[in-house]
A protein has these predicted regions:
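N-acyltransferase acceptor-side catalytic subdomain
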Residues: 1-235
Length: 235
């Protein structure tokens, strides 16, 4: 049974999510900053297609990346060492999320609808959503965005117009998270690409316990800044 939630109602317990499709917990509600932050604090995220109601998910198991387990290939290490890209943070959030929403691989669109773009842009203005940008010759070549609450980071999407652009942005994100004592990235869905970067599956119960602990650890809210890691310190 899928729970239908109205704008004033709370989420049901994540243990009540469906097994098939894995993790579908509820439908309805809205994408207000308050609703989104409440969802993330409970290990829930929105994912739906244009024309559907908002669908809320909490899959079991959950794909996560512990920052200390991040894997950097030799080619990526060389790209970082060469300084192929100029990296900025929170300087082009709107451009990053719109690029992530653009059709790719022959598909007509992505799950990042216009309503989602508006919602996460509001979160960015509130200081919770962040972007990392990779620039080449003054043009945006790749990047990523996600949500930070306390010491927890929730990865949302990434894009690349040039080889390794998004991965170099991820290297810098990992360094920033280490500096902020933020040990865990929620990757939401299992993919071979994430596994190659060091992400792995954990039981939903374990993930929820980690989230409950990390989101309640105080961290400043607002725009981030970056100090590029020395090449010798790149994992």
């Amino acid at each position: 049974m899928i729970h239908w939630i109205r704008s004033t109602e709370s989420f049901p317990p994540i243990e009540e999510a469906l097994n098939d499709p894995n993790g579908l917990l509820a439908a309805g509600g809205d994408l207000s900053p308050e609703r989104l932050l409440d969802a993330y604090r409970h290990g829930i995220f929105p994912w739906y297609n244009e024309g559907q109601p908002v669908l809320w998910w909490s899959p079991d198991p959950r794909m996560v990346l512990f920052v200390d387990e991040f894997k950097v290939s030799r080619s990526l290490r060389r790209s970082v060492s060469r300084g192929d890209f100029d990296i900025t943070v929170d300087s082009a959030f709107g451009h990053v999320i719109e690029a992530c929403a653009a059709p790719r691989d022959g598909r007509l669109g992505t799950w990042i609808t216009a309503a989602m773009i508006d919602a996460y842009t509001r979160l960015h203005r509130h200081g919770y959503a962040h972007s990392v940008e990779a620039w080449f010759d003054g043009k945006l070549a790749g990047g990523l965005y996600g949500v930070a609450i306390g010491r927890m980071f929730y990865g949302e999407s990434m894009f690349a117009r040039l080889t390794d652009a998004s991965k170099v942005a991820l290297v810098h994100l990992i360094e920033m998270l280490k500096q902020r004592d933020m040990p865990l990235i929620d990757c939401q869905q299992q993919t071979p690409h994430l596994a190659r970067l060091g992400a792995r599956l954990v039981p939903r119960r374990v993930f929820a316990e980690a989230v409950a602990r990390l989101v309640n650890s105080p961290q400043p809210v607002g725009a981030w800044s970056i100090a590029a890691p020395p090449v010798a310190e790149v994992p």
